[in-house]
Swiss-Prot record:
Signal peptide: none annotated. It catalyses: [ThiS sulfur-carrier protein]-C-terminal-Gly-aminoethanethioate + 2-iminoacetate + 1-deoxy-D-xylulose 5-phosphate = [ThiS sulfur-carrier protein]-C-terminal Gly-Gly + 2-[(2R,5Z)-2-carboxy-4-methylthiazol-5(2H)-ylidene]ethyl phosphate + 2 H2O + H(+). The lineage of its organism: Bacteria, Bacillati, Actinomycetota, Actinomycetes, Mycobacteriales. Keywords: Cytoplasm, Schiff base, Thiamine biosynthesis, Transferase. Pathway: Cofactor biosynthesis; thiamine diphosphate biosynthesis. GO terms for cellular component: cytoplasm. The active site is at K98. This is Thiazole synthase. Belongs to the ThiG family. It comes from the Bacteria. 1-deoxy-D-xylulose 5-phosphate binds at G159, A185, G186, A207, T208. It is an enzyme of class 2 (transferase). Homotetramer. Forms heterodimers with either ThiH or ThiS. One of its GO terms (biological process) is thiamine diphosphate biosynthetic process.
């Protein structure tokens, strides 16, 4: 049986599905979806949360016993991302951070230069850094060499639901990585999540695929099952693809 435990930066999680909180119509629906997903780690965009009041999303995660993963979503440069991460560490008491440094609001693609700069500073400052990155094997290797605890390549741009645009690059990142690979962004439905795991990813992070679905709790349950199925399939080993048919029963 495949190992169901996700290990990142010395921490262990019983689910390989990491959830995001953006896009939910209200906290009640978000709560139902989080419970249905079985997630043990969920991102929180710190620029959009009032941490001091202890209300809203952070209070919900605390009540459900789900670890909060602060996120530097919306940051446009290394300095802004580093400051946001430092404030999150003060507010939440965790050194784990999902590092996002975006290039522009239209594509929400990572700014590779600023991302590397921010990652270097945060690793030096003792953070456990999980960077949201392009599906670029060279950049992923660079982030690992810096000391990031995982790499989180996108499947396709945030919120597009286009699935995994370049599965070959994801496979190359997985093959070269010595740290966990988390497919982050672009998931549209359960088959996308299963494919990410079949390609060898250690986990999947998604938000709007669930929070903006017609029935978020049901989609969350589907995603959880898909991640488990994809992980099991990867561990089991698929049969090779063949050009010609091959009978499954021997000739008598």
């Amino acid at each position: 049986m495949a190992d169901s435990v996700l290990r990142i930066g010395g921490r262990e999680f019983g689910s390989r599905l990491i959830m995001g909180t953006g896009g939910a119509p209200n906290l009640s629906v978000l709560e139902e979806a989080l419970i249905a997903s079985g997630t043990e780690l969920t991102t929180v965009a710190m620029r959009r949360v009032d941490a001091e009041t202890g209300t809203g999303v952070l209070d919900l995660l605390n009540r459900l016993g789900i670890a909060a993963l602060p996120n530097t979503a919306g940051c446009r440069g290394a300095a802004e991302a580093v400051l946001t991460a430092q404030l999150a560490r003060e507010a939440l008491g965790t050194d784990m951070v999902k590092l996002e440094v975006i290039a522009d609001e239209r594509t929400l693609l990572p700014d590779a230069v600023e991302l590397v700069k921010a990652a270097e500073q945060l690793v030096d400052d003792g953070f456990t850094v999980l960077p949201y990155t392009n599906d670029d094997p060279v950049l992923a290797r660079r982030l690992e060499d810096i000391g990031c605890a995982a790499v989180m390549p996108l499947g396709s741009p945030i919120g597009t639901g286009l699935g995994i645009s370049n599965p070959h690059n994801i496979e190359m990142i997985v093959a070269a990585a010595g740290v966990p690979v988390v497919l982050d962004a672009g998931i549209g439905t359960a088959s996308d999540a299963a494919l990410a795991m079949e390609l060898g990813c250690d986990a999947v992070l998604l938000a709007t695929a669930v929070t903006r679905a017609s029935d978020p709790p049901t989609m969350a349950a589907a995603m959880a099952s898909a991640v488990t199925a994809g992980h099991l399939a990867r561990q089991a080993g698929r049969i090779p693809k063949r050009f010609w048919a091959q009978a499954s029963s021997p000739a008598l």
